[in-house]
Amino acid sequence: MYQSMDLDDIKGHSHIINEDAEFDKTDSDNTFALELQKIIQQETNGGKVQDDVLAEAIATVDVDLPYLSNVSSPGLVYGTNKQSEHPQSHGGKDSDLTVEHILGDLQSGTEDDKEFTDRLNRLLCAPDSLKRGFSGDMEIDIPSNKKRKSVYETLSPPESMSPLSDKNDAQQNRDLNTHKDFSAMKRKINSQRMLKQVPLPPKLTNEFTMTQVAEMKKRVINTHKLILNFNFLKDGYARSCEELSKTVVKLKDSEFDRARLVKENQDLKRMVLEMSKQLNEKQ
């Protein structure tokens, strides 16, 4: 569609761009540049690239005037209306096209690269946080691996069916529970370390033992006294029981005597009545 152009022609017309990254309309030789800018704007608005020669010419103009474009995106000199934040003084076109100059501009870096390096340095200076994150990732990955292994073993045929199999269920269970065994062993080791580091409580000292012995002696003496008192009470109860039995016997004897006396009294009364009757009859 467009007429092919040589790179030397584009370089020859690069001097018509002023300091504001725009074409100098006062120059009489800027007709080619204005037409080129219109063509580029039309192509960019349409979103299609029609000719490779045109893109190569744009890239050449961008390299010829690097201080008017961004180093990270060559070929966009037509869309820039601002100068770069860090302009550099160039001695001439030949010095701008040298390899050292281009590499120096590329190695200058951008703000994104600086932010990335700062973040990387901060991460390197904080190994504990990285370790914690790594351990958390490992804890998340281990159960998932165990789940995959258990699912695989449930789906796979039993190995005991084959005559050449040497594995058994105990070995499989041991392989599956390696993480649990390791965690239990780790807790046991940590508990032993804590027991060694913690000082002995006051209950396990010699003073506490002596006080416990003295209290035990007092308890033994008090128990012996209680036993003696119990024996004394038992003897007194036995004596009171004997006396009670004796009194009961005496009470029985007294009752017998009273009954005998009552009977004698009745006999005497009867005898008195008989004698009084006889006396009355004689008179």
From Swiss-Prot:
It comes from the Eukaryota. GO terms for cellular component: cytoplasm; nucleus. Coiled coil: none annotated. Residues 148-174 are annotated as: Disordered. Transmembrane segments: none annotated. Keywords: Cytoplasm, Nucleus. It is found in: Cytoplasm; Nucleus. Its main location: cytoplasm. Residues 157-174 have a biased composition (Polar residues). Involved in cation homeostasis and in the regulation of the cation stress signaling cascades. This is Protein ATC1/LIC4. It comes from Kluyveromyces lactis (strain ATCC 8585 / CBS 2359 / DSM 70799 / NBRC 1267 / NRRL Y-1140 / WM37) (Yeast).
